[in-house]
Structure formats: structure tokens, C-alpha cells
Amino acid sequence: MYRLLSSVTARAAATAGPAWDGGRRGAHRRPGLPVLGLGWAGGLGLGLGLALGAKLVVGLRGAVPIQSPADPEASGTTELSHEQALSPGSPHTPAPPAARGFSRAIESSRDLLHRIKDEVGAPGIVVGVSVDGKEVWSEGLGYADVENRVPCKPETVMRIASISKSLTMVALAKLWEAGKLDLDLPVQHYVPEFPEKEYEGEKVSVTTRLLISHLSGIRHYEKDIKKVKEEKAYKALKMVKGTPPPSDQEKELKEKGGKNNEKSDAPKAKVEQDSEARCRSAKPGKKKNDFEQGELYLKEKFENSIESLRLFKNDPLFFKPGSQFLYSTFGYTLLAAIVERASGYKYLDYMQKIFHDLDMLTTVQEENEPVIYNRARFYVYNKKKRLVNTPYVDNSYKWAGGGFLSTVGDLLKFGNAMLYGYQVGQFKNSNENLLPGYLKPETMVMMWTPVPNTEMSWDKEGKYAMAWGVVEKKQTYGSCRKQRHYASHTGGAVGASSVLLVLPEELDSEAVNNKVPPRGIIVSIICNMQSVGLNSTALKIALEFDKDRAD
């Protein structure tokens, strides 16, 4: 009997092992039952007890707790044990093979995102990273929909805000390459509905090139020209180093500029993402003046770009075209009208063709009526520091400057297409097996060349180029800080913040001769909370992955 019981117990334990191997698939698989022999009756009770006991012990050793799908930290591409076989629809998805060499960078970057998310009180945030053209990490933290406890995931769709400007630039560049658009003709050549302008009694010309780099003098959301000029003067005064004590006039200017700064920063630093440090200094909220810019919250639907021009076309220019940088989303509304006239297509139709070419199949204009899968809700903090839904807005007046929805994956595709076009001309193509870029190398070089008299407000080391901010390579002292060349654009809208950053590889002869483009790191981050500065976070993440890539 002892020999028989030992045999049955061993068989039961052996059967139990694979069923409780630590994976969800194994945990739900029903184990096979032991085969009963003819002499079993005498020890039935004891035999079953020993068998079940062995099965329970092995199961408890191997079982892994299953995280609830509602856990907001549980979505995205994460590093899991090989035994954890997960269904495609589960909140965790196994890390792609390309990610396994970046485990340190992923862990470090995830920790950084948790810190940023907690610091600003953001409901949800999604990140994506690609290395040399391959997506190696994407993950969502927190909630896409707080009310229904829908977790963020890589497929979550959010407002990308001013990254829309970089998308519009591709349309302009394609038309320029095709000879259908002259960047230096007055805009009235394409859009006669936009009136000719004067500045201080002098007739001036607004061109497509000036619009792209925010040098046209067309206003942003702030309509008070005096406030804007005082703020610009105050900022210029603050940047002067080593000056003597201010005069009475300078003190007055500082006082005026400081007061106005509180008001005019709402649409720019608080909504357009231009002051990362200020955004981080306190929890984002509905502070005084945050919601006084009525045009940010328009509910009116505009049928086309020409109709949208009536919001600003008769307003005076704030500066002489070409003289000063004034960030303007309305300038891109005029650019959308130029795209329509130069292409012969409606702006959105032309953009959808571009998205199709770039394989950006989840990128669409934001509209309230259509059902858009995986669309997040958008949030802000009220005066009582309570999380609330943002008011309904209609962005049809500014598709080109801040009206698109997208995912981190689509933004990575876009970044890689731009990087490929930028680099492909530098690579040896002896077998002619490299395909042309979506944009020509000379076009990309033009787009990523800093423009004089501009500002890159999300990184003071850089300048604005053509719908991208660009920081150039620089090192002033030996064995000291080295500034890497990169291009990026941030975005800030009602209830949303975003960034797309491209860190090109510093190519050497070995890479040029033996490798293929794109070479570099792309980082995209989207968040369903307004006023969250993300550029420095994206740059830190890019540098973390660049370290692992170099090892």
C-alpha cells in the first residue's frame, strides 16, 4: 500500500507542475487526473488527500498574482517573464525582441514618467520610443478616462496640440518640392481673401516662410497689442546680463511687464507649453486668467480654413514681419488656406493623404461626433484643486496649428520618416537599395535649420526653425557639458500636453558605409492634462536609450 500511495502521489505532483507554471495560460488550464488502478479502494481517502496537498504546494510556489485590468499602471509594453503568456487584449503586452537590450533605459524612463505624473497630478500619460527606426517601448500610465477607470495604453488617442504644426509643415514642404508653392510670395497670391497689411503706416508683406517660423507679426490668442509688446520688452530686459541698475523707465516697464506676464502667460506657457519650469512649479489648475482667452474655447464649427480667417484677418499686425518672433497658431490657420489653394484639395483631405502615405492610420482631426476608438478624456484642476473635465471645444478653426488627435505610435512613425529623409543623403548607397525619403534631404535640412530672430521657448538653447524647434550641437569647454543636436515640438491644448523629439545619431564613417537610416532615437509623449511641460523629460528619456544603444 505504501508503494502504491507513493506512486500515485508522485504522479499527481508531476501532473500539477505544468498546470501551475506561473503563467496565466497555465493557471487556467485544467490538469489531467491520475489513472486509478484496481487496488485503489483501500487507500482512496488518503491518496486523494496527499495528491491534492502536493498539487496545492506546487501551485502556490509557481502562481503569480494577476493584476487587475483596471489598474492604471498596468498598460503598455513591459518586461515580463517568459512564462507569462498573455493574450493580445490584456493590459500588458510582452516586450518586443528589440526592447530586450534596453531594459535599463526602460526601467529608468518609466520611473521618471511616474515621478512627472505624480508631480503634476496628471490622470494619464503615454510614452513611445523608437531606436533606429524600430519601436522598442510604448507604455501607458494612469487613466485615459478617470470616470470609467479606463487605463492608458499605447493605443490611447489624445490631442497632440501644436505638434499639428509639424504635420502641416510636411504638406507645405511637399507642395514646395512639387513647385506648386513659392514660400516667399505674399500670401495674397494664394489667399486673396486675406487683406494686405501695413505696420506703422508702412505697407508690409506677409509670406508663407514668415508664417511658418512665427515671424509674420500675426497675433496669437492675446488680442491686446500693448500687453504683448510690454511682455516682449520685459522678457528682453530680463535676458540682458551685467547691466547697471534699471532706470525709472525700466522699472515701470518691468512693473507693467510683470503684471501683464501673469495674464498673457495663460495661453502660451499654460496652454501652448512654452514654460516647462513654470508648469512644474505647481499643480496645474484653473488659476486666475487661465480661462480668459475665449478663443481657446470656441464651440463654433468652421466649415473650412477660409471661413476661419475671419477670426483674425482684420486685426493689426503686432510687429513688422520678419523683425520679431511671435508664436501664432492663427498663422497656421492661414497656412492651411494656402495648402488648399496651392494643392487644389481641401486641407483635411490633403492631410489624410499624407497620413496614409506615412502609415499614420490613427491620426485624425478632432471632431466631437465621430466615434474614435481609444479616445481619451481631457482634464484640468479647478479652483478647489479638484480634477474636472475640460469644457467642450471645437478646434475646426485651427486644424493646422493644433487640431489633430494621434497616438504615440503614429508620432514615432512620423518622427522616423522625418529622420530618414534628413539622413538618407549621407549614407553610402552603392547598390541603390535605399528608398528615397518622404521629403528630400535638402528639404529636411532647410526645415531643421534654425531661423534668425526666433525663439525656442521650451528649450532656451535652441531656435525655432520651420515648424520645429532645433537645438544645435555645441560644446564650449573640454570635459564639460556637451549639447546634442535634436529637433522637437511641444504641444499644449485644453486638457492636453504633448511632445515629439528626434535625437539623430552623430554619424561616423562606419555607420555611413555599413548601416541604413534612420539612425537615432525618437520619443513621443502625450498626456491628458494641460500645462505639463514634457520636452526635458523626452530629452532625458532619449539620452537614456542612447546610452544603452551605445553599450
From Swiss-Prot:
Q: Which family does it belong to?
A: Belongs to the peptidase S12 family.
User: Where do the coiled-coil regions begin and end?
Assistant: none
Q: In which tissues is it expressed?
A: Expressed predominantly in liver.
Give the GO biological process terms. Answer: lipid metabolic process; proteolysis; regulation of lipid metabolic process
Give a yes or no for keyword Magnesium in this entry.
no
Q: What turns on expression?
A: Down-regulated in a number of cancer cells.
- Record keywords: Acetylation, Hydrolase, Lipid metabolism, Mitochondrion, Protease, Transit peptide, Tumor suppressor
Cellular compartment(s): Mitochondrion
Q: Which InterPro entries match?
A: Beta-lactam-related, Beta-lactam/transpept-like, Mito_Ser_Protease_LACTB
Annotated protein name in UniProt: Serine beta-lactamase-like protein LACTB, mitochondrial
Gene3D superfamilies in the cross-refs: DD-peptidase/beta-lactamase superfamily
UniProt keyword Protein biosynthesis present: no
Annotated region described as Disordered, given as residue ranges: 69-101, 237-287
State the active site: 162 (acyl-ester intermediate)
The free-text function statement in the UniProt record for this protein reads: Mitochondrial serine protease that acts as a regulator of mitochondrial lipid metabolism. Acts by decreasing protein levels of PISD, a mitochondrial enzyme that converts phosphatidylserine (PtdSer) to phosphatidylethanolamine (PtdEtn), thereby affecting mitochondrial lipid metabolism. It is unclear whether it acts directly by mediating proteolysis of PISD or by mediating proteolysis of another lipid metabolism protein.
List, as start-end ranges, the regions of compositional bias called Basic and acidic residues: 248-279
In this UniProt entry, the residues modified to N6-succinyllysine are 287-288
What is the source species?
A: Mus musculus (Mouse)
Q: Name one GO molecular function term.
A: identical protein binding
